[in-house]
């Protein structure tokens, strides 16, 4: 399709189908070389006479190219293997001393050790893989000069030996791919193959004018002899093909051996130029083209990453490379022209998006893998090197892998592994020709490979995903039996449980800890009855879920508990009417969710443990708020009798008074007064103080502990309005109040205002109610903030904690109040509203009187007196 101009699939032309009108010409540097495998064992056995003969055969300005290898200056030997190079020098050039210096030409770095040079490269040339070491002799000293190769745009490396070769290189490398021009239509096959397999099991002798020598290297680069000098720039050349003889083997890249891959970025828009004919266009025909940029590794690397840089990237390149932006733009345009890269703006954006977000094209793609023989030398290096030539879309990865049948590719890319040539074929091979293979197996026929052990372990172990495996019934039974014997198991018991249940020590200890917590809450939140043996029941296996909900009593508003402490509050799907009816019935029966009840509800409602647990928790919260309000209303009445008919089933239960019956256990005003007074003295009573309060108030110790816990939470959140008044009053006069208050309990609730007995604080209040103008107002939260503002005019962060404690407001509320004052000051309006402040003071006093639960000597507000008078009638 014409619009898909960025198609990177080369047109494969069979040797037998070559157009007679096209002349077969082998050009000097017409593109990146075909990577040909060579057997290393043969490399070691080839004599020096054969090397000399090969050197003579390549006299016609042949330019040897090695990918990141070593080149011998005394002969034409080249190899990427340092040990192989050392072996060659020792055997062929015994007079050369290898224990010499290493020099990094780029940085002027000199060292005697190769390890130091490697460390230097890691530090100052990170990510650079294009090194070449050249051995030279200076002043009777052998020096290895490390340089960075000139990188052509197809991933191969070129070392220009002399000016003549450099000239021919410039001419030949400036050709434009015929596959991008209408000329290609003359040679194009009917079908563009998406997968290309290169094999070497059989080779053909080709005309002598295209003869190439196979060097005994680990990875040898085969190239064509240089073309004649009379070759014009418009001549076309066709690369020899390698004929396949065996079906390709397709392997899957799923299996990866970590740490064995050396990954370099490859631009798939580039193709092996030996597989693509070119139209030779001189680069110097482009105006203002700066040829010096061709050797700039920064620009070459940038182009290889993406051929269409953005303006910001061009600006950065201009600053780093010390060239003008215009020169860099022209250089990129020339490279795209040379390599036939012509994309529409939409294709550029699509390719950029897919490259940088890790997306790989869905077009079936193939990597041709050419493995070499296993080296028999004891050089300690990886035994197998595979060179992967990628043919596909932008953003893929070219890898050089050590190992067999493995490739660290994360995308589903099919690998076609060519056959390994025999030793005789390697010796005889001249220039094999490649042609497209129709027998290439599709990617779907890939051989399945096992996943890595580490990945399987991660999948098997649920803890790696934060999911705790649910315990079986047998494990829970053993744990519960042990728990009933001892709630704090010894190490020997834990070891025994570990052997029996198969659980870890941490899981067992956490189960015991959570179960103790749940049972303690269950005990403290239930009313104590003689026939109630639920205190010996293990409530819930808290380890069955990642998060567990405490079994909170209905009257204890455990508002600080979040059933999902590590996550944001979860929103579950709406429950049906039938599910709600089942949940409501279970909650009315018992607000404590046992393990058996939870399993029954799961089976009946089809809800998850979390959904059921969260519903019960929210239900307890809402019910606790209602009961707290009811308790305040009832305590204001000062009534000593229990009004069981006005409360709903499952109300908060404490220890019942001596004369009370049923399950309604409510604290009297005297008991509440004692608890509040003690709370003002200390929020964390000692065990002796708990026992003393239980003896004086008649309440159960568990109820007192539970009340202190809830009150501490309410105080922390600023919900205790009575705390300030109790704190301001004389605590010593409040302590011995209980006996005095009990004397006057028979008085009518709505009696007239009289002077109280034995209650200095109460008398002050009652007198103040009567006096009117001489009323002493306790400062509310806003009043405290107002006094502070009038004194300081702004909020000092150092005083914020003190203001929050005194005003019982939140941190944000205090900050917002001061911000509002600041805004009013800037607008020039009145800072405070006096009427609103007065009403707030009075309302707070009334609310405080409702919550203090004082005795009948207290004169309630009018709306409470109306309520009490109706109840008396």
Swiss-Prot record:
Residue ranges, annotated region (Required for interaction with NFYA): 272-564
Region (Disordered): 1-63, 202-236, 626-667, 732-769, 829-873
C2H2-type ZnF: 70-93, 102-125
UniProt GO cellular component terms: nucleoplasm; nucleus
Any one Gene Ontology molecular-function term assigned to this protein's record: zinc ion binding
Compositionally biased residues, Basic residues: 740-764, 863-873
Modified-residue entries (Phosphoserine), positions: 45, 47-48, 202, 648, 774
Required for nuclear localization: region residues: 734-768
Bias kind Acidic residues: ranges: 18-30, 831-857
Pfam families associated with the record: Homeodomain, Homez, zf_C2H2_ZHX
Main location: nucleus
Chain residues forming the annotated DNA-binding region: 284-346, 464-526, 569-630, 660-722, 777-832
Gene3D superfamilies: Classic Zinc Finger (3.30.160.60), Homeodomain-like (1.10.10.60)
Residue positions, PTM Phosphothreonine: 36
Sites of the Glycyl lysine isopeptide (Lys-Gly) (interchain with G-Cter in SUMO2) crosslink: 159, 441, 454, 485, 629
Superkingdom of origin: Eukaryota
Amino acid composition bias (Low complexity), ranges on this chain: 223-236
Example of a GO biological process term: negative regulation of transcription by RNA polymerase II
PROSITE patterns linked to this entry: HOMEOBOX_2 (PS50071), ZINC_FINGER_C2H2_2 (PS50157)
Entry keyword set: DNA-binding, Homeobox, Isopeptide bond, Metal-binding, Nucleus, Phosphoprotein, Repeat, Repressor, Transcription, Transcription regulation, Ubl conjugation, Zinc, Zinc-finger
Record's subcellular location: Nucleus
Subunit-structure text: Forms homodimers. Also forms heterodimers with ZHX3 which is a prerequisite for repressor activity and with ZHX2. Interacts with NFYA. Interacts with ATF7IP.
Record PANTHER family: ZINC FINGERS AND HOMEOBOXES PROTEIN 1 (PTHR15467:SF4), ZINC-FINGERS AND HOMEOBOXES RELATED (PTHR15467)
Family of this protein: Belongs to the ZHX family.
Purpose: Acts as a transcriptional repressor.
Protein name in the entry: Zinc fingers and homeoboxes protein 1
Organism: Gorilla gorilla gorilla (Western lowland gorilla)
Upper taxonomic lineage: Eukaryota, Metazoa, Chordata, Craniata, Vertebrata
């Amino acid at each position: 399709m014409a619009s898909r101009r960025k198609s990177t699939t080369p047109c494969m032309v069979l040797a037998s189908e070559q157009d007679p009108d096209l002349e077969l010409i082998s050009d000097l540097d017409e593109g990146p070389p075909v990577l040909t495998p060579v057997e290393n064992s043969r490399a070691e056995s080839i004599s020096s006479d054969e090397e000399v003969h090969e050197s003579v055969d390549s006299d016609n300005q042949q330019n040897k190219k090695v990918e990141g290898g070593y080149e011998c200056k005394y002969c034409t030997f080249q190899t990427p293997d340092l040990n192989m190079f050392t072996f060659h020098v020792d055997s062929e050039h015994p007079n050369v001393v290898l224990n010499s210096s290493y020099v990094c030409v780029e940085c002027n770095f000199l060292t005697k050790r190769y390890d130091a040079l490697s460390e230097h490269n890691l530090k100052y040339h990170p990510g650079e893989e294009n090194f070449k070491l050249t051995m030279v002799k200076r002043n009777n000293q052998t020096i290895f000069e490390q340089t960075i190769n000139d990188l052509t745009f197809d991933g191969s490396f070129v070392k220009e030996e002399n000016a003549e070769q450099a000239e021919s290189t410039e001419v030949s490398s400036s050709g434009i791919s015929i596959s991008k021009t209408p000329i290609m239509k003359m040679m194009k096959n009917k079908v563009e193959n998406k997968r290309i397999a290169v094999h070497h099991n059989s080779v053909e002798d080709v005309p002598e004018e295209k003869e190439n020598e196979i060097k005994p290297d680990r990875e040898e680069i085969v190239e064509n002899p240089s073309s004649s000098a009379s070759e014009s720039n418009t001549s076309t050349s066709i690369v020899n093909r390698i004929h396949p003889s065996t079906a390709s083997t397709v392997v899957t890249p799923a299996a990866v051996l970590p740490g064995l891959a050396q990954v370099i970025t490859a631009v798939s828009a580039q193709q092996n130029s030996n597989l693509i004919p070119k139209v030779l266009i001189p680069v110097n025909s482009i105006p203002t083209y700066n040829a010096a940029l061709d050797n700039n590794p920064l620009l070459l690397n940038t182009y290889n990453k993406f051929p269409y840089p953005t303006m910001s990237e061009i600006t950065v390149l201009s600053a780093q490379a010390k060239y003008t932006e215009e020169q860099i733009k022209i250089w990129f345009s020339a490279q795209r022209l040379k390599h036939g890269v012509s994309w529409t703006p939409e294709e550029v954006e699509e390719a950029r998006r897919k490259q940088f977000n890790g997306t790989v094209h869905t077009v079936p793609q193939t990597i041709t893998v050419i493995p070499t023989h296993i080296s028999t030398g004891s050089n300690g290096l990886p035994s197998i090197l595979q060179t992967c030539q990628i043919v596909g879309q932008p953003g893929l990865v070219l890898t050089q892998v050590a190992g067999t049948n493995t490739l660290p590719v994360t995308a589903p890319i099919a690998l076609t592994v060519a056959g390994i040539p025999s030793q005789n074929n390697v010796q005889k091979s001249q220039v094999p020709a490649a042609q497209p293979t129709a027998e290439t197996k599709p990617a779907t026929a890939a051989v399945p490979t096992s996943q890595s052990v580490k990945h399987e372990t991660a999948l098997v172990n649920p803890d790696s995903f934060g999911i705790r495996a649910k315990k079986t019934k047998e494990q829970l039974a053993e744990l519960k039996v042990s728990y009933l014997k001892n709630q704090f198991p010894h190490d020997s018991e834990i070891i025994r449980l570990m052997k029996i249940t198969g659980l870890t020590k941490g899981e067992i200890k956490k189960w015991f800890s959570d179960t103790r917590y749940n049972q303690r809450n269950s005990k403290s939140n239930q009313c104590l009855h003689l026939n109630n043996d639920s205190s010996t029941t293990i409530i819930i296996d808290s380890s069955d879920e990642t998060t567990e909900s405490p079994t909170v009593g209905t009257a204890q508003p455990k508002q600080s508990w979040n059933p999902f402490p590590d996550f944001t509050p979860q929103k579950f799907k709406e429950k049906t009417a039938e599910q709600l009816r089942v949940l409501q019935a279970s909650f009315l029966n018992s607000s404590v969710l046992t393990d058996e009840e939870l399993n029954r509800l799961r089976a009946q409602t089809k809800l998850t443990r979390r959904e059921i647990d969260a519903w019960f928790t929210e239900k307890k919260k809402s019910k606790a708020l209602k009961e707290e309000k009811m308790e305040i209303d009832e305590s204001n009445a000062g009534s000593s009798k229990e009004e069981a008919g006005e409360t709903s089933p499952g109300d908060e239960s404490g220890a019942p008074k001596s004369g009370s019956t049923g399950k309604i256990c409510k604290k009297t005003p005297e008991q509440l007064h004692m608890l509040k007074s003690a709370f003002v003295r200390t929020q964390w009573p000692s065990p002796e103080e708990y026992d003393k309060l239980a003896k004086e108030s008649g309440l159960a110790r568990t109820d007192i502990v539970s009340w202190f816990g809830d009150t501490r939470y309410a105080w922390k959140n600023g919900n205790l309005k009575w705390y300030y008044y109790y704190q301001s009053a004389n605590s010593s006069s409040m302590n011995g109040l209980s006996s005095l208050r009990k004397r006057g309990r028979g008085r009518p609730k709505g009696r007239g205002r009289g002077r109280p007995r034995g209650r200095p604080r109460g008398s002050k209040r009652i007198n103040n109610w009567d006096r009117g103008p001489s009323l002493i107002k306790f400062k509310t939260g806003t009043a405290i903030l107002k006094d502070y503002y009038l004194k300081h005019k702004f909020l000092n962060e150092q005083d914020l904690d003190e203001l929050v404690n005194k005003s019982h407001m939140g941190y944000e509320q205090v900050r917002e109040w001061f911000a509002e004052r600041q805004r009013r000051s800037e607008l020039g309006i009145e800072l405070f509203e006096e009427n609103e402040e007065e009403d707030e003071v009075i309302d707070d006093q009334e609310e405080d009187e409702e919550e203090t639960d004082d005795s009948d000597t207290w004169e309630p507000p009018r709306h409470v007196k109306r309520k009490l008078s109706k109840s008396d009638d």
